[in-house]
Amino acid sequence: MLLRSPSYAGKAAQAQEGDAYGVYQLATLLIGMDAEDETSCLLAADALYRLGRLDDAHKSLLVALSQRPQAAPVLVRLALLQLRRGFCYDANQLVKKVAQSGDTACLQHMLDIFHHEDLQLLQDHCHTRALSILRARPGGSDSEAHTREAIAYLSLAIFAAGSGGSESLLVRARCYGLLGQKKTAMFDFNAILREEPGNVKALCGRALVHLALDQLQEAVDDMVSALKLDPGTVIPEILSLKTEVQLPLTQGLYTRCRVLLNQCLHTGVPLREEDTQGLLAMGKALIRINATQPSWRLLLTDILTGLGKYQEAGTHLQEALHLTPSSEAAQARQGLLQLKKGDVSAAVHGLQCLAERDTQDLGFLLCLLDSPERQSLVQTAAKEASNILDLGNPGQALSYCSLAILAGGNNPYHLRLRVACLTQLQEYDRALRDLDRVLQHPAEDSDLPRQSEDFCTRGRLLLSLGDKDGAAGAFTQALALAPAQAQNSLLEQPGQAMTASVFLIHGQRCLEEEHFEEAWTAVQNGLLVDPSHSGLKKLKLRTRKVATSGCRLH
């Protein structure tokens, strides 16, 4: 009867009073049968409280206390009555005994009996007392004892609050964190967030617990949610952390931004509004945490560029350039923003510095360009590369070639241009890889002379790498595609003598291995280049002589 809610349907104040009086009479009968029965005394005290007879309730509780001085259910009722009557010192002593007993759950059965305003008094008292204990908490071995005492008061405050004790839950969770009880702290943070999903302090607290449990992704998730809601609260929390704790968290935020940006740019799917908010919140927060970190400045520049906020992006880029004037990553972004303004030449100059240094970062920046911007960039970069190469500076031309290739998608013309640069720089392996990419493109009949020249170039590269057999094979393919053009090219380089020597050595090896048709082809190709070569003529005779009857030579 006492536990009925005040909002019980059709329940008038008079009826409630009647219930309480009936309970009191029943409790009095029970006490008459057994004066030492604590439950009956508590029932009588609760009924008297509901009847507004606080002094009589107090007397009833004193009787129960005399029989069991440490009974937490009696102590907490007495404390609440003393608070109601304004006797704060007495109430504090009683609450202290309850806290020391550890039986904070005794409040559970009182929530529907005592008036909300009285429970609020108890909650405020316990919460305030816990904060006082924590503020006065000493260092060393006594620190843990004070923290546990504060937890006991907070637990009373939480029970008294029912479902509205988020502040006490928050402080208790932090106390558990201080004691290293991470999972218990997580339980309290989760309890807050179930009722208040947007509680920023709880999100921050849970993020730090996740971090302590090596759950970095979950920590970043919570911190991002908090940053979107109230960066002004979150940033001081992060700044208050020790460096060894702050570092993985800020790095996690940085990485999350990069992943989101890359996913958006590479898939072509526009960012959702919540992702945009998260990116801006993270990017701006990192700057406020450490404005002297160049990579974070560049991150915010990229975020703003991706969102089309070029002027604001330029402002942050200038800060990055001020911090690290020689940064190639910053210079490349300056080039990108210049391209957005229509200055293609300046853009090419800025972006080419990454082409040979950091192709991954350059690839990211190129994704920020639309198709016409890319096309202009490719054409200008290729033209600049060709001009510089003509001036005899392959090292400088190389980065422009690479920019054209990365922006233009492995265009054969641009690849051949880079092959020429790499060959002059004697980077034969890399030149060969580029040329092989060219040769993977199917050739039309009109392209056969061009492809023949590609095989001549391939043979020369293999020759430079010491692979004479490979060179002979490439020269053979060139002669098969366009004989006259290939002969002229080979006579020019590597020259008549060297080309004939390559075919001679290859033919001799084929003959020794009894690959008669290959040997014959090598001899014939060698004599095309040098018809009077005595060694090749002798090899031709030997090949005819040793060839078996089953091998037809033409």
From Swiss-Prot:
Q: Which PROSITE patterns does the UniProt entry name for this protein?
A: TPR, TPR_REGION
Please report the residue spans annotated as repeat (TPR): 38-71, 166-199, 200-233, 294-327, 328-361, 411-445, 452-485, 500-533
Q: Which Gene3D superfamilies match?
A: Tetratricopeptide repeat domain
**Keywords, A to Z?**
Repeat, TPR repeat
Matching PANTHER family? TETRATRICOPEPTIDE REPEAT PROTEIN 34 (PTHR44874:SF1)
Name of the protein = Tetratricopeptide repeat protein 34
Naturally occurring in which organism (per UniProt):
Mus musculus
Taxonomic classification: Eukaryota, Metazoa, Chordata, Craniata, Vertebrata
